[in-house]
Amino acid sequence: MGFSVEEARYLAANADQIAQVAPEVALTKTSVFADRAVLDRHFGDYARAVSVLIASQRAAAGKFPSHWLTDDAAVQQATPARVARVRAERIAAAGAAFVHDVTCSVGSEAPAFSAVGLDWLGSDLDLSLIHI
């Protein structure tokens, strides 16, 4: 489930606190009520968004750094880092100097393009993704 713009702003502003609390929640079927109590205590009305963020960050392994702000849809749609690296190398070898990813979501391919020396700009129609 995605985030509203308000939730995205909250998550960005509270990323450090979320990172500190994340190890306290397992986010399993058997821990759901205990996890929700922890998240409610720390984040109140934003507990659902924080839960989605933590679960999504954990699922992002192999696609982009786990500390990035993301949601479950962005993780599912993200290009795996190895695939992004090959794509970036091919585009650089073709002589491009600049890449504009018009549907970048959370920008999972940006590090690969940066690593091969290409300038990269990402945009997306989803305003909440722009905020995260």
Predicted regions mapped to residue ranges:
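Conserved class I S-adenosyl-L-methionine
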Residues: 96-103
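Conserved SAM-binding motif I beta-strand of class I
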Residues: 119-124
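S-adenosyl-L-methionine
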Residues: 1-94
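Conserved small/polar residues in nucleotide/adenosyl-binding loops
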Residues: 130-132
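Conserved SAM/SAH-binding beta-strand->alpha-helix loop
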Residues: 126-128
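Conserved SAM-binding loop of SAM-dependent methyltransferases across substrates and taxa
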Residues: 106-118
